[in-house]
């Protein structure tokens, strides 16, 4: 499947493809079979600077937008890889970049850009509150001294904990009964995962059939320094949407990459598979569903870039949901 010409992202596509060629199908099949993590692949993406695409240049990143980041994720999947192993670092940037203080950005971003730290995890979902985020029950109570928050509660389906140094955590700092709007009273924190595992956070891996590990988290009087609060207390729901909007768009791009991978593979196959003396690709009953899939992928691609345009312009993100679907 040829890309539209001219493609202003062609240089990015070519560079990512050159990297991905070094990790062929056999590599990703082995990782999947072993239920492992593509450590070498993620490290290569990090060293090449692709996972720091959205980090400003003054912090060691590339200073690119969501559109460029989405092309990176698309090409990873289009090459047969699994961007789900590392896309968290891309979309978690949205919350930190837009709402972190200058001091927080100076502390975290250079080390994330260099690969010294990984920010792959986001703690939002809870057992009884999946899509209705405003009903979360995990609490973060500020101590009497004011220098820390004490976290209690539970999260579920939290990915890449074992392969991340930091996690963005959403917790209630004001009870639901005390706020005027249910979207108020939640706050965002940066959590040092290695320290948290020693001082109040328990990780319980969940056996699953998806393409990456995921976990339950239990918090029992976990103390987080007050300086790890991102933005204003109580505004976390609004802040987390920046990360979630980026997440939806990046996953849409990955799905487009998957679709293009399948179209390319099936087109090659139906041209080679011969039945009754001719390739099966000459049968319209085979051609039609491939053509339909191609059309759907191209439509999704247009919606993806519309969503990127809105995000990068900091405009309302109503298009994001449709891009993800």
List each model region and its residues.
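Flexible, small-/acidic-enriched active-site or ligand-binding loops
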Residues: 135-137, 195-225
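A structural signal for short hydrophobic beta-strand segments in well-ordered beta-sheet cores
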Residues: 138-142
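Cysteine-centered functional microenvironments
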Residues: 123-127, 152
